[in-house]
Structures are given as C-alpha cells and as structure tokens.
UniProtKB/Swiss-Prot annotation:
This is Photosystem I P700 chlorophyll a apoprotein A1. PsaA and PsaB bind P700, the primary electron donor of photosystem I (PSI), as well as the electron acceptors A0, A1 and FX. PSI is a plastocyanin/cytochrome c6-ferredoxin oxidoreductase, converting photonic excitation into a charge separation, which transfers an electron from the donor P700 chlorophyll pair to the spectroscopically characterized acceptors A0, A1, FX, FA and FB in turn. Oxidized P700 is reduced on the lumenal side of the thylakoid membrane by plastocyanin or cytochrome c6. The PsaA/B heterodimer binds the P700 divinyl chlorophyll special pair and subsequent electron acceptors. PSI consists of a core antenna complex that captures photons, and an electron transfer chain that converts photonic excitation into a charge separation. The cyanobacterial PSI reaction center is composed of one copy each of PsaA,B,C,D,E,F,I,J,K,L,M and X, and forms trimeric complexes. InterPro entries: PSI_PsaA, PSI_PsaA/B, PSI_PsaA/B_CS, PSI_PsaA/B_sf. Residues 8-22 have a biased composition (Basic and acidic residues). Signal peptide: none annotated. It comes from the Bacteria. It comes from Prochlorococcus marinus (strain AS9601). Divinyl chlorophyll a binds at M700, Y708. GO terms for biological process: photosynthesis. Divinylchlorophyll a' binds at H692. Its EC number is 1.97.1.12. Keywords: 4Fe-4S, Chlorophyll, Chromophore, Electron transport, Iron, Iron-sulfur, Magnesium, Membrane, Metal-binding, Oxidoreductase, Photosynthesis, Photosystem I, Thylakoid, Transmembrane, Transmembrane helix, Transport.
Length: 767
C-alpha cells in the first residue's frame, strides 16, 4: 500500500525570506532511457507483460516515486508548466490552421451563409469527397468548435493576426517548458512556500483571476468592442464612417493598433476618447457607451453585447482584486484560513461535533489529493454551469445559430464536468487512504460524517430506489397505456398532467421581475433584456434561424428531469460510498492497509472483490456516462423540437414513452448518420460504426475473468514453444483491476465517439 510521504523542510523560518532551494536536483537525461526509473522493480525492465501496465498505472503517481512530500509537490508544480506548454501548443495549432487552412475571412464577411472550416482533406485514396462546399469558394471539413465565433468576439479580422497568435503561442509554450525545468531543477520552491495558503489565495484570486480578468477587459474595451461595433454595422447594412470613410468591408477597417488612437476610437465610442479625468473625478457615466448594461442579445449577431461583456470582465476583475486581499499575509491583518476553520463548531442539535472543523485546515493544506478533490468537484460543477449558460446566453457572435456548435459545446462541457466530478470522488478516496490520520480527526466534522456513514448511505440508497422506481415507472405506465390504446390515461400535457410547477415558478418570477424591481443604486426598473430569453422572453432570429427562444416546460420535462435526478443520485451514492468506506467497512475492517486499489481481500475471503475505493470510481464512471447520455439526449431533442423548430415540436408528446425515445429520437434522428455514405459527412458513418466496435470491444474485458485469458495464453505459449519462437517476455493476463480499467476506458471512448458521430451527422446533415 502507498502512503503519502512525510513532509520535510524547516518550519520556523518566514517563507518569504528563503522561498526556494537552488539546484536541488541536477538534470539527468539518462533517466529517460530507463522506463520506470522511479521504481527499482520497474527499472529492471519487463519480465512479463504486466510490466507495461504497471508502468502506466504508476507513471504519474508521484507518491510512489519518492519518500518526500516536498519532492512530490515540486513534481506536481513543475508538471503544471508542462501542462500549460501543451495547451499553448494546442492553441498554436488552432491559430495556425485558422491562418493557413481556413475560410475565416470568407466566414467573417458572411457568417449567416458561409460555414466555418479549417481543415482540408488531401486526395490520397479518394477521400476528398469529405471536403464539403462551405461557401466563399472554400471546400473543406466543417468544424463545430465555435472557434471562429470566438475569434470574431476577440476582434480578429484577418489571417495575419492568427499567424501572429500562432507564433506567439509557440513562444509561450517554450517559456512554459523552460519554467517547468527551471522550477524543478534550478530554483525549486520549498514546502513552506507551497503551504503558505493565504499568500497563495492572494496571488491566485487577485493576481491570476483578478488581474487576468482586468487585462482581458482592457482588450475587450480597446480592441474587441470597437471591432465588434464596426463588424456589426457592416453585417446590419449600415456601416459606420471613420474619418469621412465608410467602413463597408473588413478591408476598410482600421488596424488594431489604430483603434487605440483617441481620434479614431472617439468616433466609435466617444467615452473612450474622453481621457482619464472622468475616471478620477468619478464621472463614470461618461464611460457608459462602452461599459454597458444593455442585457439580452445583439439582434444582429444573436449574442451578448460586446460592451456588456467588457463591463462584466471589468467588474469581475475589480471584485476579485479586492477579494484576493482579504487574507492575512505580510501585515497581520485579514483572514487566517486556519482560524476560520478552527473556530467553526458543528451544529449542536443536527450535527454535534465537539471539535468542529479543527484539523481540517491541516488535512486540506497537507493532502494534495484532498485539494485536488475539492478543486475537481468545483471545476466540474462550473463546467456544467458553463454548458447551460452557453445556449441560454450565447457569448460569441453568430454562435447561437450554428446549432451543431451549440450542441457540441453543451455536450463537451457536460462530459468534462462529469469526468471531473468522478475524479473528485477518486482523489477524495485516495486522500482518505493515504493522507487521513484518524488520530488527528477525533470528534471533528469529518470524523462525525464517517461515524454517520451508514445512515447517510442507507438513506441515499433509499432515495435512489424511490427516484428510480417512480421515475421509470411513469414511463412504463405511459408505454403500457399507449400500447393498449388508452391515451386518456397517460401522463401527458393533454391527459393526466404532471406539470413542473416549481421550475415554471422559477421561470415566471424571473419574467415578473421585469419592470417591478429596481436596479441597485438607481431609480431604473429592471429592463426586460436583463434576463435570458429562455425565461418567458421573446424569440431572437438571426439570418432566418432561431438564435434563442422561450423554453416551455411540461410533463415530458418533469419526467425526464426525475430520470436525471435518479441517475445523479446513484452516481453520488457510488462515489460517496467509495470515499466514506475507503479506509474500513464491516466487511473489510482493515481496508486502509490494502490501499486505494485492490482486487479482493486475499484468498479464502469470498465476496470481498470490487470493494476498493478504485472500484467505486470504476462503477461511478458507468453511471456518470449513463447519466450524461440522457442529459445530452434531452438537450438535443428539446432544442431541436421546442427552440430550433427542426422536429415539429414532437418532444412533449413523443418523449413521454420509452418507445418514443427509441423511435422518434434515436432511430429517426440517426437517419443522417446511417445514410451518410457517399456524402461529405460519410466519415461520421464510419466513425459511428467504428465507435460501436470500440464500445463492444470493451465488453470482452468487462465480462470475462482473468483466469479464462491466462488459460488461453498458456495454450498459445505452448504452440509457440513447439515452433521454437517462444517470447522472451512472458505473457500474463491482465489483472482484475487492469481489465476493468481497459474495459471502462473503451466503454467510455466508444460511447462518447458514437454520440459524437450521431450528433454531428444529424445537424450537419440537416444543413
């Protein structure tokens, strides 16, 4: 079993006096020639095929590489720079494709008719048919990342600017790689620096988030918003005039650096040319032309107003800079996280914990897995919130009418959120096994939760059963009634209604707030446009397509939402059980000594397999996948039916039966991917079949046991020996845990890629 290594380093010195250690570890390229160099066992090389799997399992498990927590933390810190380098290279590739292989200029000139493309297929074996006619004399593969819409919002108007960004991103990647090497080999931070929580919060909140948002606000104000104003005027057919010249095309537009000239910018936003005097005299109304609170969507682009976005980033940046300074660092004032936590007591009636939150600060500060768990849970939740905001409040010009991009980005952010939340459960389990010391948590809230785990899990189990039987039961009832020809006895908007009254109430109070509530600090009533149109608003149309419209809710939504609730609760049940029972259970009291992942509790103990914390993560991944599949199916059909007008509003009556989901969603909408051969979307037909194969391949790992394969290998090795071609590396069947890992990976990749092909072919096929 692996336990996180103990801390090292001096505790008494002030952190800022000596925060780094110089030349702690020389650069040694010889290690790169020896896979598994961190382990004496792995570094000897493979004797059996199990070696390669152990290499993969432990490559990033820094706890097993070193006996020093400081060293492990430095590796994590250094790896962050490597991660940033990969991100910059990825961004550079996107910019380069936009600069070299895309129709960005053509799309920018006519975004309602030209489709975005940034890749052209070479005619090697006849696959050039994948290059569709996307308009503007461009043939290529249509993309759905939303990157063109984002570039337009940034204020990028030509391919030269994209090439400059591509070069800049490569330079940044090189700097990040250098920083990763430098801060591990040349000037590595000490443990005290990593443990200086208040200083970290100060720099992350005020520095990274606050100053980052403020800097982006500066770009939006000086480049993004003026460029958007000029482009919007061109698209609306009423171009602006600058210095007596009509800006009728993109070629007529001023260069980005010219937009910083007060004489030019003053003709677009007079407030921007008014100087800083108004700022220091608090006459901020002078800036209300470029820092707005219009609300709603720009009718030309179907997206949020760029001046509203500028205002948002400015306000958020200021709030974060102020908020980042509320922690006690150098001057003895402000909050101490330890004092805050240690002073919090448990509720004396509902949750008696005599020692309250004592010990939690140390646990969170010292356990990297506990920190990662909380961060993953929060970031995953934020990703899911982002996915919902992107269609309700479209941030980028013309993105709302690019339906494939809207659906793709919703799906993308939902998957990210789900994977991160499962990751939160995984690292919480590792933290409990490796970092949790029961002696330091006697009678605090964490200890009390662990003592109440049986009540928590049994009640959560009851909730899952209740939700599952009732929500699924509604569908079974409806299928039965429809099969028997009794529509009057079904749960539907036209028979026995189950209206989502609470959700409808939330929608109505949003809408009723218009004109009645006053904006803070003013006598102005809340304007209608301050709300998303999905809350009983009005339809916004761009280029003859619906950008956003009110989203009505009815019986069908209540039914599927209770399926969502059921699946979310089961996923949480599995993850929470894996965390609360990570160290011990009635079945295996000494589970902590077995580690985070183990197949069974040794020979002679039947019925103790698949109980490790790792196995709970394994099971939760399946439930997360099932849960999010229904969520993205619901979103796809609901938007096509009730907002975009593509399926004749059939969601309310068809989705209330299981047969309706199979017939009118899966089967009917799969027609595009199944009939894609011979068209430019034929790759999605191939992907649909290939991804099904990958998914089916996973079942081989999930259904059959280790012994079956080992028995088969023995026979195959015997045949090789007979032919005198015996392998030097002895074949070994995958362990139980390895088989499950390979199985769930192929299950998820196959399922996600199948959905990807299904969604893309559907909406690309409809044009």
């Amino acid at each position: 079993m692996t336990i996180s290594p103990p801390e090292s380093g001096e505790k008494n010195k002030k952190v800022l006096e000596d925060p780094v250690k110089a030349d702690p570890r020389p650069i040694d390229f010889a290690k790169l020639d020896k896979p598994g160099f961190w382990s004496s066992k792995l570094s000897k090389g493979p004797k059996t095929t199990t070696w390669i799997w152990n290499l993969h399992a432990d490559a990033h498990d820094f706890d097993v590489h070193t006996g020093d927590a400081e060293e492990a933390t430095r590796k994590i810190f250094s790896a962050h720079f490597g991660h940033l380098a990969v991100i910059f290279i990825w961004m550079s590739a996107a910019f380069f494709h936009g600069a070299r292989f895309s129709n960005y200029s053509g799309w920018l000139a006519d975004p309602t008719h030209v489709k975005p493309g940034a890749q052209q297929v070479w005619a090697i074996v006849g696959q050039e048919m994948l290059n569709a006619d996307l308009g503007a004399n461009y043939n290529g593969i249509q993309i759905s990342s939303g990157i063109f819409h984002m570039w337009r919002a940034w204020g990028i108007t030509n391919e030269s600017e994209l090439m400059a960004l591509a070069i800049g991103a490569v330079v940044m990647a090189a700097l990040m790689l250098h920083a990763g090497i430098f801060h591990y080999h040349k000037a590595a931070p000490k443990m005290e620096w990593f443990q200086d929580i208040e200083s970290m919060l100060n720099h992350h909140i005020a520095g990274l988030v606050g100053l980052g948002s403020l800097a982006w606000a500066g770009h939006c104000i000086h480049i993004g918003a003026p460029t958007a104003a000029l482009l919007d005027a061109i698209d609306a057919g009423s171009p602006l005039v600058i210095n007596g010249k009509e800006i009728a095309t993109i070629a007529d537009m001023p260069m980005p650096h010219q937009l910083c000239d007060p004489q030019i910018i003053g003709q677009i936003f007079p407030g921007l040319a008014s100087g800083t005097g108004n700022f220091f005299s608090l006459n901020w109304l002078a800036f209300s032309d470029f820092l707005t609170f219009k609300g709603g969507l720009n009718p030309v682009t179907g997206s949020l107003w760029m001046t509203d976005v500028s205002h948002h980033h400015l306000a958020f940046g200021v709030i974060a800079i102020i908020g980042g300074h509320m922690y006690r660092t150098n001057y003895g004032i402000g909050h101490s996280m330890k004092e805050i936590l240690d002073s919090q007591q448990g509720d004396p009636i509902l949750f008696p914990a005599p020692k309250g939150h004592q010990g939690l600060f140390e646990f969170m500060a010292e356990s990297r897995h506990a920190q990662l768990s909380v961060n993953l849970a929060m970031l995953g939740s934020i990703s899911i919130l982002v996915s919902h905001h992107m269609y309700a409040m479209p941030p980028y010009p013309y993105i709302a009418t690019d339906y494939m991009t809207v659906l793709g980005l919703f799906t993308h952010h939902m998957w990210i959120g789900g994977l991160f939340i499962v990751g939160a459960g995984a690292h919480a389990g590792i933290a409990m096994v490796r970092d949790y010391d029961p002696a330091k948590h006697i009678d605090n809230v964490l200890d009390r939760i662990l003592k109440a785990r049986d009540a928590l899990i049994s009640h959560l189990n009851w909730v899952c059963m209740w939700l599952g039987f009732h929500s699924f039961g509604l569908y079974i009832h409806n299928d039965t009634m429809r099969a028997l020809g009794r529509p009057q006895d079904m749960f539907s908007d036209s028979a026995i209604q189950l209206q989502p009254i609470f959700a409808q109430w939330v929608q109505s109070i949003q809408a009723s707030a218009v004109g009645t509530f006053l904006l803070a600090g003013t006598s102005e009533a809340l304007p209608h446009k301050a709300l998303s149109e999905v809350f009983n608003g009005s339809l916004v149309e761009v280029g003859g397509k619906v950008a956003i419209a009110p989203i009505p809710l009815g019986t069908a939504d209540l039914m599927i939402h209770h399926i969502h609730a059921f699946q979310i609760h089961v996923t949480v049940l599995i993850l929470l059980k894996g965390v609360l029972y990570a160290r011990s259970s009635r079945l295996i009291p000494d589970k902590a000594s077995l580690g985070f992942r183990f197949p069974c509790d040794g020979p002679g103990r039947g019925g103790t397999c698949q109980v490790s914390s790792w196995d709970h993560v394994f099971l939760a991944l399946f439930w997360m996948y099932n849960c999010l599949s229904i969520v993205i199916f619901h979103f796809s059909w609901k938007m096509q039916s009730d907002v975009w007008g593509l399926t004749g509003g059939n969601f309310a009556q068809s989705s209330i039966t299981i047969n309706g989901w199979l017939r009118d969603f899966l089967w009917a909408q799969a027609s595009q991917v199944l009939t894609s051969y011979g068209q430019s979307i034929s790759m999605y037909g191939l992907m649909f079949l290939g991804a099904h194969f990958i998914w089916a391949f996973s079942l081989m790992f999930l259904f059959s046991g280790r012994g079956y394969w080992q028995e088969l290998f023995e026979s195959i090795v015997w045949a090789h020996n007979k032919l005198k071609v015996a392998p030097t590396i002895q074949p070994r069947a995958l362990s139980i845990t390895q088989g499950r890992a390979v199985g769930v990976t192929h299950f998820l990749v196959g399922g996600i890629a199948t959905t990807w092909a299904f969604f893309h072919a559907r909406l690309f096929g409809l044009g």
